[in-house]
Amino acid sequence: MQGYGGLFNRQRVPRFRSIENVARRKLTMLNNAQSLQDLRVPPGNRLEQLIGDRAGQHSIRVNDQWRICFVWQDRDAYEVELVDYH
């Protein structure tokens, strides 16, 4: 997970200190999801199908600045990225 895999493994990642608890919770939700519909709750996830350069990906929000982007295939998330959208 490109430098943030430690978040999922309960390690502290200095770059993400301000969002680590929320990001960890969202990564766990993503890991546990059996379908995209599972990610619609809570509504704050704001599950979106992305377009443009990220066509084929989906995202859930960590906060107003950060999103977790991923490709959903065969009931699992692949190519997971924690992305600064600003």
Question: Which residue stretches match the model-derived regions?
Answer:
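Enriched for short, Lys/Arg-rich terminal
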Residues: 51, 57-86
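Short, solvent-exposed, low-complexity loop/linker segments
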Residues: 18-42
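Arg/Lys-rich, positively charged N-terminal/basic patches that mediate binding to nucleic acids
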Residues: 1-26
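A short, surface-exposed loop/turn module that caps and links secondary-structure elements
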Residues: 34-58
